[in-house]
């Protein structure tokens, strides 16, 4: 029986035809290559597109919408400083007038 098994093993090893196991292995390897080369690439592109649509693009829109307001806030700060200076001048003038009227 040992020689029969050895003969079958030699035939299997030297065989030019595919076995069921080798056909399944080739199919698995082909599927693996397809998944890595095609499906994974498409999935990455889809993910990148969805990420841009859901995350990046809305942030860019918000930035563009409120960036002009941020620049106006800088103008607002300048206006506030000018108004503060004018109020201090008016307060100083009123104090001088009150002091003069109290003396006279």
Swiss-Prot record:
TM regions (residue ranges): none
Classify the source by domain of life: Eukaryota
UniProt entry keywords in alphabetical sequence = Endosome, Transport
Q: Where in the cell is it found?
A: Endosome
Its principal location?
A: other
Q: Name one GO cellular component term.
A: endosome
* Functional note: Component of the biogenesis of lysosome-related organelles complex-1 (BLOC-1), a complex involved in endosomal cargo sorting.
Q: Give the family this protein belongs to, as stated in its UniProt record.
A: Belongs to the BLOC1S1 family.
Q: Subunit details for this protein? A: Component of the biogenesis of lysosome-related organelles complex-1 (BLOC-1).
Q: What is this protein called?
A: Biogenesis of lysosome-related organelles complex 1 subunit BLS1
Q: State the organism named in the record.
A: Kluyveromyces lactis (strain ATCC 8585 / CBS 2359 / DSM 70799 / NBRC 1267 / NRRL Y-1140 / WM37)
Q: Which gene encodes it?
A: BLS1
């Amino acid at each position: 029986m040992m020689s029969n098994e050895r003969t079958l093993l030699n035939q299997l090893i030297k065989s030019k035809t595919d076995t069921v196991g080798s056909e399944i292995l080739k199919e698995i390897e082909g599927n693996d290559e397809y998944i890595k080369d095609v499906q994974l690439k498409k999935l990455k592109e889809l993910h990148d597109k969805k990420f841009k649509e859901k995350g990046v693009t809305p942030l860019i829109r918000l930035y563009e919408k409120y960036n002009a307001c941020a620049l106006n806030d800088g103008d607002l700060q300048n206006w506030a400083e000018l108004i503060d200076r004018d109020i201090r001048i008016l307060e100083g003038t009123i104090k001088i007038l009150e002091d003069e009227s109290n003396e006279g």
